[in-house]
Amino acid sequence: MTTAAAIAVVSALAVSAHAQSIAGPYLAARSAALQSDFEQAASYFTQALARDPGNVQLMESAVVSQLAMGRIERAAPIATALVSSGQQSQIAELVLTAKSILDEDYQALAGKIPQGEGIGPLVDGLVGAWGLMGVGKVSEALAGFDKLAERPGLLGFALYHKAMALASVGDYEGAEQIFASDGTGSVVQTRRGVLARVEILSQLNRDGEALELLQRMFSGATDPEIDLIVAALNDDEPLPFKHVASVQDGFAEVFYSVAAALRSEAGPEYTILYAQVARALRPGHVDALLLTAELFETLGQHDEAIVVYKGVPSDHPAYHAAELGRSAAMRRSGKPEAAIEVLEQLARTHGQLASVQSALGDALRQEDRFADAVVAYDRAVALAEDSGGPSWFLLYARAISNERQGNWEAAEAGFRAALEVNPGQPQVLNYLGYSLVEKTEKLDEALGLIEQAVAASPDSGYIIDSLGWALYRLGRYDEAVPHMERAVELMAVDPVVNDHLGDVYWAVGRKREAEFQWARALSFVDEDDPLSEAKPDRIRRKLEIGLDAVLEEEGAAPLEVAQD
């Protein structure tokens, strides 16, 4: 072998070993990123980058993963290297901007016109204006907001932040003039925008207008934060302006308002980057915290959401909202008992809130603790009576719990009460109609209720199954067949629907097809669920001796075709 050939072999082996050394962490990182597991993705991308430091794709991915976890300090060195390599990266610019703000290097941001693509016109414009505020150039900053307002689609954001900038330096009159103008758009109609304006009006001793604004915007709806604000206004206590009390708060508000807007426009994996910057710049920004937790939930990262929700202090007015979110995330992550414990503790501290009692009822109902659920629902209904009355769903959920524990009289009354609140609600119409069919009560009314439900929700397998089953119970077997077949098309692996179709087939003489459907139902049934409507022992008995014989054994009425 020549020297050149030997060098080529050694070089090939080195390249192969290098490729193998990076492949493991890279593939693991890609897999984690696809599942939105940013914690693992950040770890593996960092490992891969350590083995291939100049790889700009790895740099970008590592920056994204670290930022998604809110780790600006870890993302910043990688972002610096990425930009230094000549690579244009919006996310790297986002990280470096956040790092400058954290370092209070406002001069670097004042009126900044980004080289390359920057972060984007909206963020770059707002950051530049707030940077000017940070170095004391208030007039130039206000002009910067005005210039940004001239760009299509950015007027509302620019004016909102101009109002916040004015209020942050005590010019509440100027801030209110902006809010009172017609051009501010939807940005100031958000809950956060409304509450900021309420604080400004209070600083101007215009408490009556502040109260009227709350009533107009929230239509009397209340929560602990609004209750505290209303009480202070009624007592003539001036509300401090807390929404943007400093330049740092202003920067945080930039990224929060962009994240809130992106929520309905972009994917959660992108939106969370802006929400995390807002949190990093202002750790006490509870709205940003709640948004971040909700985005983690949307991404299926329930454990991360649980951690973030836990960050809301127990004395904050939004604590109950955070605990409701934390319990929901626990339930979705397979920890139902822990979720119930959180809600039970919350009911001890915030039991005066109908939403807390209702959530506790829901969690208990989902664990088949129907008697306990009814107790919680009763409290929720009583509390709701004092604030406009209970929702149809609250009455419906309580009725289900009563029905499942055998209290049919209360259940029927509850379903009918829910229909008074929402007369055409298909879920309620279906549940009431189906329950009447199962009890062989008021069958004509039951059929009418279910037909209304089908008209309102024609693609619901459960509701179409109810219609077919009602027709079967009425002895209208031939009419039941197409509806039951359609229900099975929509819910192919549901044991109850397959069992029902088997019974209908048997009733019209299609016995072999009936046995096939019963066998399918048996393959899908959960043997460990005693509350399941599909009873495996009964299905097996039908397969052994047929439906007619089973009905005879049970002392039930035989199959009989309805007479016209």
Residue ranges and their predicted role:
Residues 34, 68, 102-103, 134-135, ...:
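Register position in tetratricopeptide repeats
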Residues 17-24, 113-120, 239-254, 385-392:
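TPR-adjacent "capping" and linker segments in tetratricopeptide-repeat scaffold/adaptor proteins
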Residues 51, 84-86, 116-119, 150-152, ...:
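Structural marker of alpha-solenoid helical repeat scaffolds
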Residues 58, 92, 124, 158, ...:
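TPR alpha-solenoid repeat register
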Residues 61-62, 95-96, 127, 161, ...:
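Canonical tetratricopeptide repeat
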